[in-house]
Regions:
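Short, charged, amphipathic alpha-helical segments
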Residues: 1-3
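A helix-boundary/hinge signal
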Residues: 5-8, 15-27, 31-781
């Protein structure tokens, strides 16, 4: 009993320090309270505000004066301006939500929606004024659930959110090493959990209808869209501009950066934008209540300061805010569409029959494409001025930049930069979080990934972690750093080897310039835990799996802007499955087409009419390892379709033909496959998920399993899995499980292993002096 009580108190203490650190990546690992102490202490030291400059440049260290400076700063930001011109901005935004859908949105909210919203919330997030994290409500839902649900439903169904639920803290996190002004801090909004529940329920209902209402030029936050779609289009267009060395029309790309996009949204403009989309009165009132009943207090060294009542702005941290911002951004889309229709602005098409692209949204970033003419640039400035007056948005000139096509004369470039007041992009500058251009010096283009990984690995705090903690850090943080880049670009093999070398050194321990002994091969560490590895990702295979997702999306989303742009340029007369790599293609395209074999290995056709599927060439036999036909078929044209095996009148297989052409076991598989009487189109599905939908995770597992199957030994894999699962399920601290894992992999510094590496002169046991010390048990004793 005493031991259980000590363990309970120890777990409670560790939980407290975990929440104070905080480290979202360390979901499991060793119990390492010293690590969390150091993280929390360092965090407090960094976030502590010793003084601030006021508007006159005078340094103030008195907390009362600092509180006044902070309060005045946020009051100015959250005070509405004299916005105008709503109708001009929103004239092109038409009702995209039908009356029937608006009625569905306005129906009463149910208790099940509240519970679903809670289940979707991350358990340990920073608490708001209520002092609670979602984990409290999840743990004690059987006690507080009824009251919380009643409170949330009352607000949702009445359309009035009480101010007591909508109070919000603003925490200030330094953006620079030595902050002096309030602007040098990043404000983090901390909402009450009950308000987040209300907001999340509202979002879950809204987002089902917004995908059809928001234009395809916006690829963030919406179901069925990925931000990488627009990233691919943008970089393909930039590649076209770079290669455009002649032609009468000079062209350019303008990346717009909006300053404090959420904070400056005018509520009156937002309300008009929502109404133009066709939302019902009840939904409009509820949304406006969510954003207008808020009031802020700023945390100054842990103490709330001020009581700020805003008259404009959205909160980062509110689940509703990203979707409301998308609705506002439709105003800019409307103005640009009108200018394009009137011929004032001309978009960029990367080939003769390709779609013209004039605007792409990336959440709160935008990229405009137009001709490099002073008149068009002046029109863009006029549009932005109108949009700023109505929406409250403001262009950040310092972070806005231009990229010109190669054929644009230098004089024209200089003049346009003067008109717009922004610089042009150089070779390796960042663009949308990635290198603006990927040319011959590819390694230099992606060097920032190596620098970020190195910076994370060199953090002194991570040296406090055991190998169990370092495992989780590698998986959750280090190997996740390049994911955004790897979704669009294939990293060079040399860079991949360098990244893996850095990760290996960190895993085994690295002090200064001397690395510790690597007792197990990297390939072994990358194997799944159930077969004796640690489940680290092989970066090259993971890149292929991520890029394969782009191929899959192009196969299944043929109406998307991304597919239409790439099809027009690279495979106008066929599908991406039959496309050829172009020598003049961008590095983006070469990266994507290089991952096509991953899809070919894992895809299978689901037969509808059979008119799109070739008997000999395609994978269409269910229940087989490779889904391909192996029967020795008689000579036939390679493009003979599966439809020739189907009787269209009966919607059934031609039994005699099938039995005559195929081996008995394949004929049985074909005849046992049902055909739909609705005769749907043939469809490609992914064979490695139950739903038939592609996931990068399943593709990676498929690639790894292919290697394992080709190198598998004669040992019993089931018994191996049982053995290793037993180790990882031991009810002991994670560092002990890792020690057992090292014993089983002969990865401990026994004298035999040290002698094999010429570290000690003799492998003989120092206790008995008779036998080699190769038994881990001897070390334990």
């Amino acid at each position: 009993m005493l031991r259980e009580e000590i363990q309970r108190l120890k777990n409670r203490e560790e939980c407290v320090w975990k929440q104070r650190s905080p480290n979202a990546w360390l979901k499991e690992g060793d119990s390492n309270s010293w690590f969390f102490h150091c993280r929390a202490n360092q965090r407090n030291h960094i976030n502590f505000i010793t003084g601030l400059e006021d508007n006159d440049g005078v340094w103030r260290e008195d907390e009362g004066r600092m509180g006044g400076i902070i309060k005045n700063y946020f009051k100015e930001i959250y005070t509405a301006s004299n916005s105008s011109g709503f109708e001009e901005i929103l004239s092109g935004v038409h009702s995209a939500i039908s009356e029937e859908d608006a009625g569905l949105l306005d129906r009463d909210f149910q208790a099940s929606e509240v519970r679903l919203a809670l289940d979707q919330m991350i358990p340990l997030t920073a608490p708001g004024p209520d002092g609670m994290s979602p984990i409290f409500y999840k743990s004690f839902w059987h006690i507080v659930g009824r009251d919380v649900t009643s409170m949330a439903l009352n607000a949702l169904n009445s359309g009035v959110v009480p101010e007591s639920l909508n109070s919000t803290f603003i925490a200030l996190i330094p953006k620079v090493k030595h902050p002096k002004k309030v602007a040098d801090f990043h404000p983090i909004r901390l909402c009450n959990v009950v308000y987040k529940l209300i907001s999340k329920v509202l979002v879950d209902r809204l987002k089902k209808f917004l995908a059809s209402a928001i234009p395809e030029t916006q690829s963030a936050f919406l179901s069925g869209r990925l931000i990488s779609d627009n990233v691919l289009v943008a970089f393909e267009t930039l590649h076209y501009l770079k290669r455009k060395t002649n032609g009468k029309v000079d062209q350019m790309a303008l990346k717009l950066d909006m300053s404090k996009v959420y904070d400056r949204v005018e509520w009156e403009f937002l309300e008009q934008a929502i109404r133009h989309l066709g939302l019902g009165e009840r939904m409009v009132s509820l949304i406006m209540s969510c954003i207008s009943t808020v009031f802020y207090s700023v945390l100054l060294n842990g103490q709330p300061v001020g009581n700020i009542k805003p008259s404009r702005g959205l909160r980062q941290g509110d689940p509703l805010s990203p979707y409301l911002f998308l609705m506002c951004a439709m105003g800019l889309q409307s103005l640009l569409n009108k200018a394009e229709m009137e011929g004032h602005i001309r978009g960029v098409a990367i080939c003769r029959n390709g779609p013209k692209v004039s605007l792409l949204f990336f959440a709160d970033d935008n990229v405009l494409f137009c001709s490099a003419k002073e008149a068009e640039c002046q029109k863009i400035l006029d549009i932005l001025a109108i949009y700023e007056r109505g929406s409250g948005q403001k262009i950040n000139q310092e972070k806005t930049n231009i990229f010109f096509s190669t054929n644009t004369p230098h004089k024209v470039q200089v003049r346009i930069q003067q008109v717009l007041g922004v610089p042009s992009i150089r070779q390796f500058e960042k663009f949308l979080g990635l290198s603006a251009l990927v040319g011959r010096a590819k390694k230099q283009s992606f060097i920032f990934i190596k620098e970020r990984v190195w910076k994370n690995l060199q953090g002194w705090k991570e040296k406090l972690l055991s190998q169990a903690g370092r495992e989780v850090l590698i998986k959750s943080v280090i190997q996740a750093i390049p994911t955004y880049t790897m979704c669009c670009f294939k990293l060079l093999k040399g860079l991949v080897r360098e990244l893996e070398s850095m990760i290996r050194n960190f895993w085994w321990g690295y002090s200064g310039e001397h690395r510790k002994t690597h007792w197990v091969k990297w390939e072994r560490l990358c194997e799944a835990k159930e077969v004796g590895g640690l489940g680290f990702k092989e970066i090259e295979k993971f890149i292929d799996a991520l890029l394969a997702k782009q191929v899959w999306r192009m196969i299944n989303n043929i109406d998307s802007l991304c597919h239409r742009v790439f099809k027009a340029r690279f495979f106008p007369n066929c599908s991406i499955s039959d496309a050829k790599e172009s020598s003049s293609g961008s590095y983006t395209w070469k990266s994507i087409i290089g991952a096509r074999d991953v899809i070919r290995k894992g895809m299978v056709w689901r037969i509808g009419t059979g008119e799109a599927v070739r008997i000999k060439e395609d994978r269409w036999l269910p229940g087989r390892a490779n889904c391909s036909v192996i029967s020795p078929l008689p000579p036939m044209a390679p493009d003979v379709k599966v439809s020739s095996l189907i009787d269209p009148n009966r919607v059934a297989w031609r039994t005699e033909v099938v039995q005559q052409l195929f081996l008995p076991h394949e004929a049985d598989i074909i005849l046992g496959s049902p055909l739909s009487t609705r005769r749907p189109d043939d469809r490609i599905i992914w064979a490695h998920t139950p739903s038939g939908t592609f996931t990068s995770c399943s593709a990676y597992k498929m690639l790894v399993s292919c290697d394992i199957s080709t190198s598998a030994s004669g040992s019993n894999p089931d018994s191996q899995k049982k053995f290793w699962k037993g180790i990882w399920q031991l009810r002991v601290p994670n560092k002990i499980r890792h020690f057992v894992w090292r014993m089983c992999n002969n990865a401990l510094p026994t004298l035999v292993n040290l002698h094999r590496r010429n570290i000690v002169p003799s492998p003989t046991c120092g206790q008995c002096h008779n036998y080699p010390e190769d038994s881990p048990c001897g070390m334990v004793l």
